[in-house]
């Protein structure tokens, strides 16, 4: 009977065949231990010399790392393993023998591993991170579908930039200029006027020359836009979403979190409502903590965000940033028009901003004024301005960076480990 490592638990004391790769092995004179993986998990195969044909035991000792195999044997309980079971191997069939696999069991430097990212993905820890990434995506769709959102796919090639910055990848679109999308927000706002609540999930591109552990050039973003929703209501949806994702990973990725040695007690504390601190109060807090490199009207750097998040040891919303450091489309704060109705959600443990969101300007005259103040081409944003001409309503939106969120939940040091093939400042290969 053919099965997988994950499904093998349903076949205790039965003979099964599993297609797998050999990740490592060790042997004594009488027993060989094969570390097997098949994409669904990792399992040990035990080959006892006295219980198999001589050729099988010889093969078990000689087979090379990352060779592909069909392994047949009996699934037995083993409380010492992460899975709780292993295979007593009876026969081995080599599908393809690997030669001189470059990533050996010894330690390798990061650059070497990134050069061999196509192979590094096979390792136990990298496999665990990708499984957690997959669960975050699955839980995302579950949350938005259950809450009545419609998925919309905004274009990746655009003629304008929602952030109004110069950090764009430029390309030619026949005889026109085009850019790789920084965000689908403007298109999602249009879709929200048709469907009420919408979300998207796709790649975004930032031509930022950043080399921090938080930054990728290409990353995936989950964005939501909601009509007839105010800023406070949007924050509630955001914290419910993040809490749902964290709980889903805790429930469905126990083994992966164990492999990564993640301190799950920190994740178990994540619950609504999240703490909130205004930008003004955050500045005062940082001053009281001895930070003299930040003044009102300046954006926070990584050390500032880390200090604020560590104070709460939970995801925390920093709200109502100064108007001058935020994009043109954010709604003024009626209590202080020098600030806007926005919030960044900062993850604890130094992972930084994972969500940025705001209430959007819904008044045509004000939005036209903002477009001019930011030096933007009004014609390029004419479709966006149309949304305020024809039945404008209060509405809000936000975007969550997938890789930073996965890094935080997984506890990995750098976001490069949370993308299958990360695009970094000096890396376009593999």
From Swiss-Prot:
Catalytic activity, as annotated: tRNA(Asn) + L-asparagine + ATP = L-asparaginyl-tRNA(Asn) + AMP + diphosphate + H(+)
Question: What Pfam families does this protein's entry cite?
Answer: tRNA-synt_2 (PF00152), tRNA_anti-codon (PF01336)
Q: Which InterPro entries match?
A: Aa-tRNA-synt_II, aa-tRNA-synth_II, aa-tRNA-synth_II/BPL/LPL, Asn-tRNA-ligase, Asp/Asn-tRNA-synth_IIb, NA-bd_OB-fold, NA-bd_OB_tRNA
Under Enzyme Commission nomenclature, its number is: 6.1.1.22
Alphabetized, the UniProt keywords read: Aminoacyl-tRNA synthetase, ATP-binding, Cytoplasm, Ligase, Nucleotide-binding, Protein biosynthesis
An annotated GO cellular component: cytoplasm
User: Member of which family?
Assistant: Belongs to the class-II aminoacyl-tRNA synthetase family.
Quaternary state and partners of this protein?
Homodimer.
For this entry, the protein name equals Asparagine--tRNA ligase
List the source organism: Staphylococcus aureus (strain MSSA476)
Gene that this polypeptide is encoded by: asnS
């Amino acid at each position: 009977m053919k099965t997988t490592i994950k499904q093998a638990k349903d076949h205790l004391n039965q003979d099964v065949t599993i297609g797998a790769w050999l990740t490592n092995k060790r042997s004594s004179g009488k027993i060989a231990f094969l570390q097997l993986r098949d994409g669904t998990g990792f399992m040990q195969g035990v080959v006892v010399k006295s219980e198999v044909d001589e050729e099988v035991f010889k093969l078990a000792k000689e087979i090379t790392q990352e060779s592909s195999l069909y392994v047949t044997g009996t699934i037995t309980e083993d409380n010492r393993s992460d899975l709780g079971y292993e295979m007593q191997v009876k026969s081995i069939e080599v599908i393809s023998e690997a030669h001189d696999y470059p990533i050996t069991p010894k330690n390798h430097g990061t650059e070497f591993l990134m050069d061999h990212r196509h192979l590094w993905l096979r390792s136990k820890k990298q496999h665990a991170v990708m499984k957690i990434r997959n669960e975050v995506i699955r839980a995302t769709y579950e949350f938005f579908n259950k809450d009545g959102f419609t998925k919309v796919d905004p274009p990746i090639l655009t003629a304008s930039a929602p952030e109004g910055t110069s950090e764009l990848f430029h390309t030619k679109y026949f005889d026109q200029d085009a850019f790789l999308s920084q965000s689908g927000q403007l298109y999602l706002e249009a879709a929200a006027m048709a469907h009420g609540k919408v979300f998207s999930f796709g790649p975004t591109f930032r031509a930022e020359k950043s080399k921090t552990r938080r930054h990728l050039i290409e990353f995936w973003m989950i964005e939501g836009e909601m009509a007839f929703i105010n800023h406070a209501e949007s924050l509630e949806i955001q914290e419910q979403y993040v809490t749902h994702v964290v709980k889903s990973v805790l429930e469905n990725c126990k083994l992966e979190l164990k492999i990564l040695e993640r301190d799950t007690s920190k994740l178990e504390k994540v619950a609504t409502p999240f703490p909130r601190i205004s930008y003004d109060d955050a500045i005062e807090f940082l001053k009281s903590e001895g930070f003299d490199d930040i003044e009102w009207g300046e954006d926070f750097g990584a050390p500032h965000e880390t200090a604020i998040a560590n104070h709460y040891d939970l995801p925390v919303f920093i709200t109502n940033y100064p108007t001058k450091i935020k994009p043109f489309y954010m709604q003024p704060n009626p209590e202080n028009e020098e600030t806007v109705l926005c919030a960044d959600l900062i993850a604890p443990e130094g992972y930084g901003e994972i969500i940025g969101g705001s209430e959007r300007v819904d008044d045509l005259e004000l939005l036209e004024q903002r477009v001019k103040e930011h030096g933007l081409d009004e014609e390029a944003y004419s479709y966006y301005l149309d949304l305020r001409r024809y039945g404008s309503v209060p509405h809000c939106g936000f975007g969550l960076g997938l890789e930073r969120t996965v890094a935080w939940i997984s506890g990995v040091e750098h976001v490069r480990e949370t993308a299958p093939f990360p695009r970094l400042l000096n890396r376009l290969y593999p």
